[in-house]
């Protein structure tokens, strides 16, 4: 089946309506991208975490992540934040979207924050270190997460 699509021509009335939409105010909010990176290290299934070095959530363990820049996709932001916060310069290739978290007031900052979470399984990529707003980066065995460590990612 062949489908022909005719492009929309913007008439003056359509353009005027679009200008009106651009002027409409919307509540401010931020979009972040987080990434859960899993690997096998020392014969154990492990997750890459950071310790927050700044408020909010100072000292808490979290997934690497941060706010999107205006010129990047959520996937690009996840890759950039991974490098900035863990010094892990890996070509992830395919990121799988895990979930989007958008509950109002899930983040204590002034504006609403919506988070797109991704995950990836990679080969053991070696040691990591904290950078930018991460005090440190560490590999944590997943079986220890279930028992001893609580990862803070905000109420969802």
Show the residue positions of the predicted features:
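Generic N-terminal leader/processing signal
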Residues: 6-7, 148
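Short, positively charged and aromatic/hydrophobic N-terminal segments
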Residues: 1-3, 9-10
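N-terminal strand-loop-strand
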Residues: 15-62, 75
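Intrinsically disordered, low-complexity regions
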Residues: 5, 15-18, 119, 125
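Non-catalytic terminal extensions that flank enzyme cores
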Residues: 8, 12-15, 90-91
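Unchanged
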Residues: 61, 68-94, 98-156
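Membrane-interfacial terminal anchoring regions of lipid-handling membrane enzymes
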Residues: 7, 22, 153-156
């Amino acid at each position: 089946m062949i489908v022909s699509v005719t492009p929309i021509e913007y008439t003056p009335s359509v353009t005027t309506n679009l200008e009106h939409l651009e002027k409409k105010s919307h509540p401010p909010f931020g979009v972040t991208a987080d990434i859960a990176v899993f690997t096998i290290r020392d014969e154990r299934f492990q997750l890459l975490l950071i310790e927050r070095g700044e408020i909010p959530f100072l000292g808490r363990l979290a997934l690497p992540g941060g706010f999107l820049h205006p010129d990047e996709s959520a996937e690009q932001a996840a890759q950039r934040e991974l490098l900035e916060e863990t010094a892990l310069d890996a070509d992830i290739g395919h990121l799988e979207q895990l979930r989007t978290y958008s509950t109002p007031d899930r983040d204590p900052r002034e504006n609403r924050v919506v988070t797109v979470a991704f995950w990836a399984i990679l080969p053991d990529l070696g040691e990591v270190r904290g950078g930018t707003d991460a005090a440190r980066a560490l590999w944590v065995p997943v079986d220890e997460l279930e028992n001893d460590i609580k990862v803070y990612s905000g109420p969802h």
